């Protein structure tokens, strides 16, 4: 499979899985009325409407802020997509695809709902992680992949990480 097709397929799969889980939890499972749903002693499903970015930073409560975040996500996805089109490494295109799919998934939420629907809450004892969704997990996994690719690229001395690579 050509690298670009692999990256685009990864982005599409991430987007579809993200939106399917959100629609399923909102419409079919009626999570807003049933929350919290305990999955395990350390995991539950809840409803959080995130008007900010990662970890709730930069909360935007105005329409201007909402649309600025949508615009930033679209521009970032386009830039990463352009990088993906020129990338040769499988890990690089997979990582970029995860990030693009996650960014677009969260942008769809902002357009449809005015905020991002987060629902997975992990916790143990007094420790609690931020509530997140499939798109967020894709973005984090993609960034981790970029870090691994950077280390491998440096070790190989190649140009796989450069956008013109």
UniProtKB/Swiss-Prot annotation:
InterPro entries: Peptidase_A8. The keyword Aminoacyl-tRNA synthetase does not apply. Pathway: Protein modification; lipoprotein biosynthesis (signal peptide cleavage). Coiled coil: none annotated. It is a multi-pass membrane protein. The chain crosses the membrane at residues 64-84, 88-108, 128-148. This is Lipoprotein signal peptidase. It comes from Methylobacterium sp. (strain 4-46). The gene is lspA.
């Amino acid at each position: 499979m050509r690298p670009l097709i692999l990256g685009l397929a990864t982005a599409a799969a991430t987007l579809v899985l993200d939106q399917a889980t959100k629609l399923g939890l909102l419409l079919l499972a009626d999570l807003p009325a049933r929350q919290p749903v305990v999955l395990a002693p350390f995991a539950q499903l809840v409803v959080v409407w995130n008007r900010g970015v990662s970890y709730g930073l930069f909360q935007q409560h105005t329409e201007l802020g909402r649309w600025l975040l949508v615009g930033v996500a679209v521009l970032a996805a386009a830039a990463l997509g352009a990088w993906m089109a020129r990338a040769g490494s499988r890990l690089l295109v997979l990582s970029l695809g995860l990030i693009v799919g996650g960014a677009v998934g969260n942008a769809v939420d902002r357009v449809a709902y005015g905020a991002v629907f987060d629902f997975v809450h992990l916790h143990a004892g007094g420790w609690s992680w931020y509530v997140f969704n499939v798109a967020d997990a894709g973005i984090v996994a993609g960034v981790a992949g970029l870090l691994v690719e950077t280390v491998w690229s440096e070790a190989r001395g190649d140009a796989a990480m450069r956008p013109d690579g």
